Design a protein with these regions (language model features):
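N-terminal helical capping/dimerization or prosegment-like subdomains
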Residues: 1-82, 86-90, 322, 424
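Active-site metal-coordination/substrate-binding segment of hydrolases
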Residues: 77-146, 152, 417-423
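Midchain, well-structured core segments that form catalytic/ion-binding scaffolds
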Residues: 151, 157-328
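Buried hydrophobic packing segments
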Residues: 121-131, 160, 218, 264-268, ...
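Short beta-strand
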Residues: 58-62, 234-238, 309, 386-387
Length: 424
């Protein structure tokens, strides 16, 4: 693969990346009058400042929902769709280094956002700058669009699309090389049910993360422990609580994770048969493809459905289950919803659609896909075919956009996990 990036530019890139990683840009809605939190506002402003230093023209939405950096000339607009918000760091004890300090450990940079998506976003910016410095002439304007709400509801891009110029083509550097031409539909659901005076329980952090911890601190702890032992789940124990341990993964790869909420619910439901626990244990179970609920749902372009039971809250007043479902591009979403409503109702749970993103599909023979694949293969010699994904990137927010990079085939995927890292 040709190397067009000079060493001094690489050093500048790493310094800039360490700077923007240092902002803990996790959603904190409404903080200090910002839409999504002060740290998100600050990292947006800092990233645009860095872009201006590289020669880009910048703009920030007056309300702080998004910003962009643009360079070049031409009538056509190519968008590079990025985001600067990140998922929570989770339990700091699981990190070898502070998550918001971007520490170099051997050949890796470790920190929240180095893979998803601060690292790829900044790498693409410096790549364009390096090409321009080498005298490469572009016939299109290139606009880096920086979203701030990708990990939750995409309100940043909703606002952008209401106001701003639409791109003619583009890509999101928020997946893997060579290219993702199909992304499953993303349905996020909350199921509301009755509370319980004697069952305080809260587990899971984000809907798009397989929960790796679920803690019970109720008075029936002594009854629960032998049930957990018999189930075979991994857990840790303190004097007054027990925490079931799982393996965190992105929801799109839920089948590769171990869901701690499911592990706890299957045992706890045997001694406290609360409707939410019974739904999880009996109707869902450990299968992360949703087959127990829906039957086998799959298609040729995008593969199996992915089902992540991501959050659970039970208190005196109510219970709430949060679910993330990645729906194959040819599947019938409404039929799935009808089935989920029916089963949930039988457990006294009321369905609420929290968020939905329609699937992405750009044909393999389209000019965009053909061009990007040709460039990738010429530069790398790698003949890995274009692929589909259960992930949801900003590529689906605009017409004629795909996910392009930034992980190479075989690279370790650590986004949304402790010790998120990228090779440097």
């Amino acid at each position: 693969m040709k190397n067009r990036i000079k060493n001094d530019v690489k050093e500048q890139f790493l310094n800039s990346l360490q700077t923007i990683i240092s902002y803990p840009s996790v959603l904190n809605e409404g903080e200090n009058g910002t839409p999504f939190g002060q740290a998100i506002q600050d990292v947006l402003e800092k990233t645009l400042e860095l872009a201006r230093e590289l020669g880009f023209q910048t703009y920030i939405d007056p309300e702080g929902y998004y910003g962009y950096a643009e360079i070049g000339q031409g009538e056509e607009l190519l968008a590079v769709l990025c985001h600067l918000d990140v998922v929570p760091a989770g339990d700091l004890k699981d990190w070898q280094t502070p998550p918001f300090e971007a520490t170099i450990v051997g050949d890796y940079l470790v920190g929240r956002g180095v893979q998803d998506d601060k690292g790829p976003s900044l790498a693409a910016l410096y790549a364009v700058k390096s090409l321009l410095d080498d005298g490469i002439q572009f016939t299109k304007r290139i606009r880096f669009i920086y979203g701030t709400d990708e990990e939750t509801l995409w309100r940043c891009m909703n606002r952008y699309n209401q106001i701003e110029e639409q791109a003619d083509l583009g890509f999101a550097p928020d997946s893997s090389f060579p290219l993702t031409y199909a992304e499953k539909g993303l349905l996020q659901v909350k199921l509301h049910g009755p509370g319980w005076d004697d069952l305080p329980l809260q587990a899971g952090q984000a809907l798009n993360v397989v929960p790796d911890k679920a803690t019970y601190a109720g008075h029936r702890l002594e009854e629960l422990l032998p049930v957990l032992d018999q189930s075979g789940v991994q857990y840790s124990q303190t004097e007054d609580s027990v925490t079931v341990l799982g393996v965190s993964k992105h929801s799109k790869d839920a089948a590769e994770g171990v869901n701690a909420i499911v592990g706890l619910a299957e045992s706890l439901s045997l001694i406290q048969p609360h409707p939410a626990l019974l739904f999880i244990a009996d109707a869902v179970g450990e299968d992360a493809t949703g087959e127990a609920l829906f039957g086998k749902i799959t298609d040729e372009p995008s593969g199996d459905l992915s089902f992540n039971l991501a959050t659970l809250v039970i208190d005196q007043e109510q219970s709430e289950i949060g679910i993330d479902i990645r729906i194959p591009v040819l599947a019938d979403k409404e039929a799935l919803v009808a089935r989920l409503r029916e089963i949930a109702a039988s457990y006294q749970l009321e369905y609420e659609e929290f968020d939905y993103l329609a699937p992405l599909y750009v044909p393999l023979d389209s000019p965009l896909v053909s061009s990007l694949m040709a460039v990738y293969q010429e530069e790398t010699g790698d003949k890995t075919p274009a692929m589909s994904s259960g992930g949801a990137t900003f590529a689906r927010t605009m017409e004629n956009c795909v996910a392009f990079g930034a992980l190479f085939p075989g690279a370790e995927q650590t986004e949304h996990q402790a010790n998120e890292r990228a090779k440097i």
